From Swiss-Prot:
It comes from Mus musculus (Mouse). Residues 84-186 are annotated as: Interaction with BIRC2/c-IAP1. CDD domains: E2F_DD (cd14660). This is Transcription factor E2F1. The gene is E2f1. Keywords: Acetylation, Activator, Apoptosis, Cell cycle, DNA-binding, Methylation, Nucleus, Phosphoprotein, Transcription, Transcription regulation, Ubl conjugation. Transcription activator that binds DNA cooperatively with DP proteins through the E2 recognition site, 5'-TTTC[CG]CGC-3' found in the promoter region of a number of genes whose products are involved in cell cycle regulation or in DNA replication. The DRTF1/E2F complex functions in the control of cell-cycle progression from G1 to S phase. E2F1 binds preferentially RB1 in a cell-cycle dependent manner. It can mediate both cell proliferation and TP53/p53-dependent apoptosis. Blocks adipocyte differentiation by binding to specific promoters repressing CEBPA binding to its target gene promoters. It comes from the Eukaryota.
Length: 430
């Protein structure tokens, strides 16, 4: 008889039963013990002896087991890993207690994209937007020092979000910690808030461009109107200025009028000191002519300045039928000229009747356009020689004296170049 070693720890007990003669076995019989894993806490009970002998060659014995307690809860299936949950970093605690329904499959939850009205969007709570708002707070600080507690209250975010930003800025040496909750900006203040300043400058530049375009349009209109005025045949006959017209603007008793006829691109420089007033003229295009406008005489007046009352007074100014001679001078009792009256804005009807009585030849082919200003004064002197008792006094020396520019000493002025007596003239008061 042999005992199989499959019994393990029950083999000594079986040998004791066989030695006591409790079991009647033949010599060729085999005993096989089938048992499960041992339970430490369960008591071991001896097997009941058989009631009678059996003729089977193999005897089977079962190891008694203690009753197991019922499981408290079903265990989850081991074939699928546990579900990973996304953390809500905006709350004070990490996990929220709440019941969740059974998760079936990998389909999208129907209520996942629906947000409550008071819930912030993902962009509003992003670190990118929080960093921009934090830099705006730094730009408002005069010395660049910001309290982190105050910044968290203003931005309405958690302090750990502010700490994340300050740790990065401190790592790239843009800020430095002054104390536990105070930091100071180390970078350039011009870079903080540069986006808004750039936007404001762009708007200012656009407004300046619009203003420039408007001014260019107005200048173009004025240039066009002036060109049309100069090309009009009706206005060409009145395109001149006399000495009396200039005197009507300035007070002859207080001011001295000097007329300057210069070519284009003439440079004028005026030096105003406490005692003297100096004017410097320089031109590379041609000579510069300077004239002195004398005081207006009592019997001389410009035909364009004839008073309307004098025209409508009813006096007979019909000339003789003989050859045209020099017209008589206007009476000395003519009314004074109005300084506020425009020089060139005269009515044509008020001038032409006056010109008809003078019997002065006024052919249009003899008139020069406005642009030909060199010969305009000569035409005026020839046509109105009887009405101009005093002409412009030329202050320019003869053109053959080319060295007059270098013939003045430091104490000499423009009056030293001419043989005119300027003692009776009153200096200009500016």
């Amino acid at each position: 008889m042999a005992v199989a070693p499959a019994g393990g720890q029950h083999a000594p007990a079986l040998e004791a039963l066989l030695g006591a003669g409790a079991l009647r076995l033949l010599d060729s019989s085999q005993i096989v013990i089938i048992s499960t894993a041992p339970d430490v806490g369960a008591p071991q009970l001896p097997a009941a002896p058989p009631t009678g002998p059996r003729d089977s060659d193999v005897l089977l014995f079962a190891t008694p087991q203690a009753p197991r307690p019922a499981p408290s809860a079903p265990r989850p299936a081991l074939g699928r890993p546990p579900v990973k949950r996304r953390l809500d970093l905006e709350t004070d605690h990490q996990y929220l207690a709440g019941s969740s329904g059974p998760f079936r499959g990998r389909g999208r939850h129907p209520g996942k994209g629906v947000k409550s009205p008071g819930e912030k969007s993902r962009y509003e709570t992003s670190l990118n937007l929080t960093t921009k708002r934090f830099l705006e707070l730094l730009s408002r600080s005069a010395d660049g020092v910001v309290d982190l507690n105050w910044a968290a209250e203003v931005l309405k975010v958690q302090k750990r979000r502010i700490y994340d930003i300050t740790n990065v800025l401190e790592g790239i040496q843009l800020i430095a910690k002054k104390s536990k909750n105070h930091i100071q900006w180390l970078g350039s203040h011009t870079m903080v808030g540069i986006g808004k300043r750039l936007e404001g400058l762009t708007q200012d530049l656009q407004q300046l461009q619009e203003s420039e375009q408007q001014l260019d349009h107005l200048m173009h209109i004025c240039t066009t109107q002036l060109q049309l005025l100069s090309e009009d045949s009706d206005t060409q006959r009145l395109a001149y200025v006399t000495c009396q017209d200039l005197r009507s603007i300035a007070d002859p008793a207080e001011q001295m009028v000097i007329v300057i006829k210069a070519p284009p691109e003439t440079q004028l420089q005026a030096v105003d000191s406490s005692e003297t007033f100096q004017i410097s003229l320089k031109s590379k295009q041609g000579p510069i002519d300077v004239f002195l406008c004398p005081e207006e005489s009592a019997d001389g007046i410009s035909p364009g300045k004839t008073s309307c009352q004098e025209t409508s007074s009813g006096e007979d100014r019909t000339a003789d039928s003989g050859p045209a001679g020099p017209p008589p001078s206007p009476p000395s009792t003519s009314p004074a000229l109005d300084p506020s009256q425009s020089l060139l804005g005269l009515e044509q009807e008020a001038v032409l009747p006056r010109m008809g009585h003078l019997r002065v030849p006024m052919e249009e082919d003899q008139l020069s356009p406005l642009v030909a200003a060199d010969s305009l004064l000569e035409h005026v002197k020839e046509d109105f020689s009887g009405l101009l008792p005093g002409e412009f006094i030329s202050l320019s020396p003869p053109h053959e004296a080319l060295d007059y520019h270098f013939g003045l000493e430091e104490g000499e002025g423009i009056r030293d170049l001419f043989d005119c007596d300027f003692g009776d003239l009153t200096p200009l008061d500016f």
